Amino acid sequence: MGDSAVNKWSAGMSYGPVLSQTDLYLLNTELQLNPILQGTSGGFHLLFNLVTGSTGGFNAEARDRDIPFTAKDEPATLPRVTDLIIITELSPWCTIVHNDRGVTMSDVCSTIWKEYTENCITEAEYNCLPARLQEQVKRVSQNNQTAGSWPGAMYYGTPAPNRYKRVDWLRDKIFFDGLQKKDTYASARLGFKAPNIFIMNLAS
């Protein structure tokens, strides 16, 4: 009934309390993910590039026209929460998105982008990769630097292992392709499952 009058995902503060991590675990509340983050919003498909941080979208019915990402201030989940934990099967890192007033769509995109572009791969992480993948990461990193994606690109020809960015690890899978629940994977990876843990899918 409310949906016909006001979109329940509209930006704003009129959503009741924001659940902290403790509230969420005590209540064991199931979270409803914003349809745009699930990739199930009919009118808008999010295009989010993890290398550049650019966000936009398109309507599946009219793919030739770009649509601005106007939903960035909408809540990422209902009920709203202070923290989302995001992992992906394509990298070893865990991204924690935090906002005391409730995590928004913009928080999700900006935090993921910063986590992957402002943090470097450690030498130990790099050395865990098979030689073939190390070579691919090195090539991707050089391409990203040539494109001027990283500040200081001109100072490094071939970056040292600790200069590779986390986004380089993803190789060609640099486009956000939705979040989903996968409790079995979360438990295997983190040792526990929780309502606010989501798996990020990526595409090339």
Residue ranges with predicted function:
Residues M1-W93, T111:
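Ser/Thr/Pro-rich, charge-biased intrinsically disordered regulatory regions
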Residues A71-S204:
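Extended amphipathic alpha-helical regions
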